[in-house]
Amino acid sequence: IPVEKGVELFVDEVMCGGKRMVVIAGRLGVLDESESTREPPQRLAPDVAGLLAEPARFPFIDRIVEHDPYETLVSECTLDVQQFPFLSDHAIDGTPYLPGVMALEMFAEAAQLLWPACSLSGFDVVSFGLPVKLVRDEQKVRARAWFARQDDAHVWVECTLESDLVNKAGEVFGEPRQHHAGTVRLLKQGAEKPVPLIPAVGLPERGVALLPTTFIYERFFHGPRFQAHGGIIAGSSVNGDVACDGIALMRSELPNGIQFADEPVLLEALPMLIEVGFQNAGMVAMEIDRLQSLPIGIEQVELLQTPEAGGLRVRSVRRAAEADGVTLHDVLIVDADDHPVLALNGVRLKGMAPVEPEMEFKLKRN
């Protein structure tokens, strides 16, 4: 290839901040029997390239496929157990599944690259659909982000997660599969954050775990890298609604904190604390509805602070039972000083299977 063109491609590749080895060349003929070539990378604005240059951020951004600043962005990530060890601890019958909370992290990363001067505030109208499962050694996924609207304080970016249908020969066919969707809420630089929507659930009880982590993970499929629940402190109730208080673990407190091959990694969306909320609400669904449940949606997520120390506690309140085995929950996580850290308004869990009789339990409540 011409020197001038090679230099241009080299600079573009460096500015994209990718993590994998890349060869820039002209036609390779028989040297490329596996058809591993791809189009040149997108040109990125300096502020976007500057963010991507931070090694501990954006672990789910392998490359930018499309980018129209402040309008649309499409990022690509290749999921595999070596690069993302947490996948091995989120597997059913040996098949790894991408956790929904990590899809939210993908959305947050794509949205922040679309509006680089903003910071993450939360999520609205999240729906978890077709799961992403690794039936092969690796699975490519794309996060699509596009500008939705803004006001004086916030920018809203809508996101979807998709993957291609691929046959045994490695050929893409048909329309992309749609997995999850949600709206990322970003706070503008210099804007005053409006009063957050915190559910009226009271404060979780203090104390040691009445039911330890072993009790919880006898009932869940999560391995050590995804065992974010530190145990149940007590059963509780809020205005007649059944609730449960527990211990929430930070990533540094997990039984195995190596979730990524390139640790340390900074995550924008506090995904493991959202996961604690799901698991705590799931324990209530097990107890009251006798159902093993998975999250299918969240009405709103409020990210209130990034905790610097442990001692976090969680309370989830079962608000309603809807049709088809769906239960509705609100969740609040607080720090050791009772300051709110994270709020989940309107978590919907879908019952997937009845709880085995030997796994049923009942918490004491006043």
Where are these regions (language model features)?
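Acyl-thioester-processing domains in fatty-acid/polyketide/NRPS systems
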Residues: 3-22, 29-366
